[in-house]
Curated annotation (Swiss-Prot):
Stated name of the protein: Putative aminopeptidase-2
Glycan-carrying positions: N110, N534, N581, N785, N803, N914, N1024, N1094, N1245, N1451, N1521, N1826, N1841
UniProt cross-references to Gene3D superfamilies, sorted A to Z: 1.25.50.20, Neutral Protease Domain 2, tricorn interacting facor f3 domain
Residues annotated as binding Zn(2+): H390, H394, E413, H1316, H1320, E1339
Residues that bind substrate: E220, G354, A355, M356, E357, N358, E1143, G1280, A1281, M1282, E1283, N1284
Key words of the record: Aminopeptidase, Differentiation, Glycoprotein, Hydrolase, Metal-binding, Metalloprotease, Oogenesis, Protease, Signal, Zinc
PANTHER family documented for this protein: AMINOPEPTIDASE-2-RELATED, PROTEASE M1 ZINC METALLOPROTEASE
Cofactor(s) named in the record: Zn(2+)
Cellular component GO terms, alphabetical: cytoplasm; extracellular space; membrane
Keyword Cell membrane included in the entry's annotation: no
Function: Putative aminopeptidase which plays a role in oocyte maturation.
Amino acid sequence: MRRKLLLLLCFIGLFSLISTAPAPNNVGLESEFTEGHAETINLEEVEFNHPSILPEHPDNFRQDKLAARKRQSLYVTKTRLPPNLYAIDYSLWFQPYFPSPGVQYAPEKNFTFDGRASIQVEALVASDRFILNAYNFKIQSYKVVDIDGTVVPINSISQDDTTQQLSLITNANGVVAGQIYNIEFVYTGIINPYTDGGVYYTSYNDPQGNTHYMIATHMEPFSARKVFPSLDEPSYKAKFTITVQYPASQVALSNMMETEPTKIDNIWSTITFPQTPKMSSYLIAFAVGPYVNSQYVNKHNTLTRAWGWPGTEQYLQFAAQNAGECLYQLGEYTGIKFPLSKADQLGMPEFLAGAMENWGLIIYKYQYIAYNPTTMTTRNMEAAAKVMCHELAHQWFGDLVTTAWWDDLFLNEGFADYFMTFIQKSVYPQQATYLDTLQVLDELQVGLTADVRYDAHPLVYPDGPAFDDITYNKGASMLRMLSDVLGADVFKQGIRAYLQKMQYSNANDFDLFSTLTDTAKSNNILDWCGLPLNVTDFMQPYIHQTNHPLIRYNNNQKIGGSTFSQEPFLDISDLTATPWNYTWSIPLTSANLRHADPYKQWLPRQQGCANMNENIQEERIKEPNKRAVQWELTSITSATYGRIIYDDIGFDRILKLIKQDDINDNLKLTLLADEYNYMLREKKANRPFGYNRFLDLAKVIFNTQSFTNYPSYGVFAQAQPVLEQIAQLYRDGIDAEFVPRLYKLFFQNSYNQLKWQDTSIWDTDTFSEVFLPFAVRYDIGDVQNRTLNMFANVKSACINSLNGTAWCNPYSTNLRKAIYCGAAKYAPATSDYFFQMLHSYNKEVITNPYFYQEYMALLEGMSCTQSPATLKVLIRLFTTSTLNPSTIFGFLKYNPAASDVLYNYFMANPQLVNSTMLDAYLDAMTYNWNSYFREGQLSTLMNTLTLTNDQFDIFDFYINRVSLMFEYKSTYALPTYNWLYDNLVVIGKTPWEKTPNIDAVFPYYKLDLQVNIPGSGPYQWYENMTFSATSTVTFQLVSPTSSITINAHRLMFDPVSIRLYNENDENAHTPIPIDFSKVMKDYDKGTVTIPTMNNTVLYPNQYSLFIEYTGFIFQNPDEGDASNTYLGGLNNRKGWIFTTDFEGGPGARSLLPCWDEPSYKGQFEVSVFHPTDMIALSNEVDIQRTIYDNGWTTTKFATTNQMSTYLLALCVGHFSNLATVTRTGVLTRVWTWSGMEQYGEFALNVTAGTIDFMENYFSYDFPLKKLDVMALPEYTMNAGAMENWGLIIGEYSLFMFDPDYATTRDITEVAETTAHEVVHQWFGDIVTLDWWNDIFLNEGFAQYWFANGIDNTFPEQHAYSIDYNRFYMNHIALKYDCIPGVAKPVISDTPPVFGIEPYYKGSALLNLLNNVLTPAVFQEGLSSYLTQYGYVNASPRNLWTSLTVAAQRHNITDWNGQPLDVSSFMDPYTLQTSYPIITLTLRGTSTVQANQQSCMSDETLWNVPLFTQTPGALDFNWFVNFTGGNDATWLRPLPTGYRVDNAGSTSFARINYDDKSWYSIQAQLLSNMNTMSSTTRAMLLDDANFFYQSGRWEMTKFLDLTLYLVNEDSLAPWEQAIEFFTEMLNRFQYQPEIDTVRNYVIQITKNAVSKFQWNTNGLWANDRIVQLLVNVNNLAVNRQSRQVALTLFNNFVLKCKYSLSGTGKCSGIHPNLRQPTYCYGLRQSNNIDDFTTVNNLYSWFVQNAGYLQTDGSNLLNALGCVQNLDLQKTMLRSILSGDYPPSLLNSIAVHDDSSDVLYNFLLDNTQDILNAPFDFSLYVKAMFQNWSTSNQLELAKDFQNSSNYNLLNAAQKNIYKQGILTVNSNANWMLIYKTPFLEWIQKNFGAPNL
């Protein structure tokens, strides 16, 4: 019933044709927006209306024109007329017969016309015939009369339809050369359907359903001959007089302004139009019909009219005005006012081409004329304006000046295409940026793409006309390039000259280019040789060759030049030979960091310039080679005709530029286009390709501030199809979530700024129209709530509408597709939104048949529905629709839910196989399919059908496509997949969240892995830096479940590769079906959930899970699966290493599916398939090695013990090792990349020695057969080394050193790191933490016991390894545990996991426990802990319990005298932040009161164990509560001697002494410091410094303590003191009292300097003291130290000056002392040769240094020590150019006695510094670091008032302001501390005597 009602309404015309208001409410007629519910609608009864009119190409007039030309090519001949005649004048008369009101005629005349033609010609040659073009009409009579009136006898007539020529044959030589003739015809022609051109008819239907006809003409290129006999070629220009006899009820139009018609019998009218100017025949036009118009008169007084048919009047004004303004601006630009009195724009219901440029009467397809603001978007409006401006440009380029023949068609169409956008910028100046971007998008990019297609042809095309992308888009792009080369003004001057010269005639390319050459010459425009530019020569390779240049732009030098080269974009071997050999002279407009303003360059076609001096020639024609420091860009104006590809380094620099400073939209667009098209080029050539660079670029571009705030439609439109290609790969699979994440990554910021309303900015509004539907499809931002609310408002506004939604929708047309999409997608199942839209669609196709935009928006919106039921309705609509099936089914391609519904619908309706829509249907259904499962699904459908051959071919095509896409996804797309994981998904977490509902225990993993890194084993390029693997995990299920959740991250697999088996007692595998469609990844948790089919329950039993997958290797050092590169071997070649680190980041789940939590310990059976020339290492020893012939080898490893997944390790590479065996026979090896193993001997000894200690001390043998230490050339920045069980992996400098260059710090760092990781083999590997918040169970133990491992290995270093390290751990822990916002508990969920607390505070607390429990009890408790929890997991509670048992066994009591409970004791220390400060206060004169408070001043309290040292004893007491808990101990008389609480820094606390207690300690130190240990002395210095720094003490209280240092001889105290001395020397560097401070330092250290001098002895503590003393005394200008430095330096120069192997052997100076020697020796030298020597030696290290420590940094630092201003400036310039690293800035600054070298250099070189290849903050930090005077502060501020300051960008200004804050802070420090500090020095040391 509903269908009949709708059809009835259609026929009786109750709806107006084009309506903007609702029809009156009719009884019984339901409004489409009345309330309803989806569940009440019978889906099978829903019926549809279908539109009767829809343009085939609604948004692209050029496609319409191309379609027209293709149709015409079926009957057009290109046979040319002989050059016998010259056309002078035509008089034409036409009477058309077509249905019109009141007109009657014989039926046989219907859709014909009568015609009379009188043609005046001049004979150019003698002949026997007159030959003209004529086609498809009947000639009734003809006559030829010469100029004198003499009739020329015509003996016969010949009409050849093949050549479309008519010959009137007279006597021999009857046609006399030079004679003028009139040739007259009377004939009858055909009025064709609109598809056939000539005179054609079309029609429209009025609201009452009546059909109204109209006629018009379409003559281009060869159809004038269908209308009248003629010389129908462009070059035969003539004048035309046209008369039309037409139905009096109609309107007649032609090229010229109509005159008053003459009526005949009130039925017919006759009108004669004024004679035309000279013009080509194809431009003649007339039209007759019921036309109406809107008018506009422009500033040139030209009348422009927009014509339509009745009912369209209200939509024509925009066209009239736009046309008038385009005409005016074109007249202004060309300097030639439009020569006709009127310009008509006639819109027809049907027109084969989008538009036709007939002079004065342009005919269009209606949508380019009628602008309906209720349906049409901004993009539709601009498209109409563009088409009009295109056709109006033809009035000059094509009509006024016409191409001589169709080979130069670009002279018509190229100009029109160029000006259609260019001239709009003058019409709509506020939209200029948008329009210019459209020109690059729609002209340049389309032209470049067309020029490399298989059907490409030269721009000048003898086989023309070619109405295609070459002619239009390449032609327009040539003009854009010429404008850029000549300059806009010169180009305009040249175009004006061309038009003036060639007006009313015909032109070819030579005419244009020669005119431009003359103009260029008169304006002194030069070419690449510096000669006057010859435009003709320049353009020849562009117009006569296909293809375009590929410009390779190499900018990979640190400071060197960028270089260019060119080649044809396509392989030259596939191209037809040309005289230019596919080379071009390429104009480039470039900019770089040093030349930010664009400048012109040429990349010449060939070397050599004639008639020029050879030197000048070489200079002028050399390829561009500009200084390229950091970034450089070319084609800034996006005018170069070619594609530019940047090398990887240059590309990265451009990315950095875009991030920092942004670029214009056109450059963004061209960069994206060039990257994508280059990728396609490489793909076609079967070379490595990928989307990664494109994606990197897009990521940066779409997150720039400019795009975020003002999004560019053109940039988005360039990128979106590429993004869609990527989306297509993943939309239907397990990684479908990648697609919305990708769009959110790129566009979330832009979306957040969109207002969801029109802005009057076309760019933003068009972007909104195109982008927002994607935002809805991909759930960006608040689209769900917003679109649902907006559609609710639409529903409310249209509740009474009977005419659809266009007129009543309150929202912009730009937003409607998104609103409808959101309503369809997000509406709840009970909503009627979908059906409201469907009803609206049914009404819109009747209400607005010509304005299709609204009903198409409704269709596209409905395609977003996720409901199978409503999708089924939509599919039924589509399969019956009259619309283009590719368009409407194409909507469903973006909806992943649609494919299965399409499949099921086809299965239920197999008759669809006979539909003409079969191809489009299958295309949409399989568009996103790319899996083995989908291929089988499609084959199943195919096999159920009986197919014809054509149907079989269609199915076969899509089966092959699915198969190829599946293959592509798993091969070539691997790099893209890797990029998506790197950028869309969290790389890793430290730690990951716990995975809930893990019911598996005792996992046993079998991993077979192939590692694809460069080596002897071949693999496909797309497999590079990947691994392929199969993993089987056998496990015990402990509780019922219907799904398995396992950790897996960064792994690519097809769910169908997963197998699940039930393992029974007989070890038989029983397969368990898996629901592959519901296998789901959780990227944020790093898990995959595998459900059983039909939710089958898995009961407790043993199961195995098999997965085949591919994973990704980070190409830089990182956590997870990573790679290393190095240079090594005999040829110093690059090598690759595969390595793992699973403690942080991606975790082991990135290598294999596993239960990746520490508590899920399992065993691992690992087999690695790797290049044969490499070695594979893992946790266990290798047990089998199989070598294959193809360069690959399999290494199988023994099964591991039970261990946590994060300890699994692999290393593959070219390795060598040193080995030894421990006391118990453990094989110990240190591995390095080949050639470096010699430097690992020290680490090998530490490894073995630490194993021996751990085994012996804890009575727990190392359980593995071997322990390997792998020293890598690179390692993750997040860690130094990793304690994998049996295979320690870390950065090389932590395991190796070169003894010729290694300082004591270098050596001890190797010892400490190695021992630390070995200790982990017990604490972390054998016993493993239960969860990551207990990480101190690993790291605290390793940080504590490594000292004992070193001590066991090197007992002679006890003073350093034990004494110094124990103090240092406490020192660092206390330092950071009192910083708000930084400090956190040792046991904490607060990130980061790996911070100061678990390492240093954890170590300090273990030291505390060792002291409280006693070493023996602590040892016993830990041995028990290891034994009890070995191979399982432990918590802090387990540790405390083991220690408690040991403590109580030995009767250790707590603060209450009760058996000590370690947990109660340690919880406050491990679960709370900060530490206790015990403050001693003098009550009265003789009583000391102690109280406790937190360092961070909160209410936290601890039970503090304190060892108290007095002259006669060392006592132990507990301090509890606030006051200590025992007044006998803590409320005590003032001691007669000294009393040190916390002696030996045995507790984790600080003691704040009262003055009297403090000075008794100080007195003791002055009299006999050795009564206190070095640790105690260092602790006192550390505490005193802390109390002074925190404001609790006066500075002098701390300074008094330093007096005892005159006798100090231990490392820890000196390190504390010298850190303070160095700070003071730097603070006072520019204070006038600096000598006073220097004297203080020299006097305090005098005795120590005398004792230690410059003597090193191999004892680490001694050698560090020497280093510290030498450094600080040279800084303090100690004359003796400076003299020693000079002497050693002179010897050094003498010995090393000519060294060709570095300085390690020749120096003769201990590495600890080289930095001060080189620095202060060179500083005192007056010999410039010494500077040269140091500089040369530094340069040698830069060129030749390997991986290990060298003197390079020492020598570089020395260069900065010189005081020669010229040398300083030279070095600063070299830093800016990249010759020296920016670290030299710091050396120059700290050694600059004047303080202003960097500042003055900044004043003189501001721009260069800002452009330097390093961050501005480095310069500012170096410059201001020691400034502290009021003058310096004012000087720093003065720069802000200079003009140079304005050169800084916002970020740089902030950096500078931070620098001023530093100076201000330094100055404020002086205000507080300077006076008391100096007075104290004066008091104790007197005046300086240096």
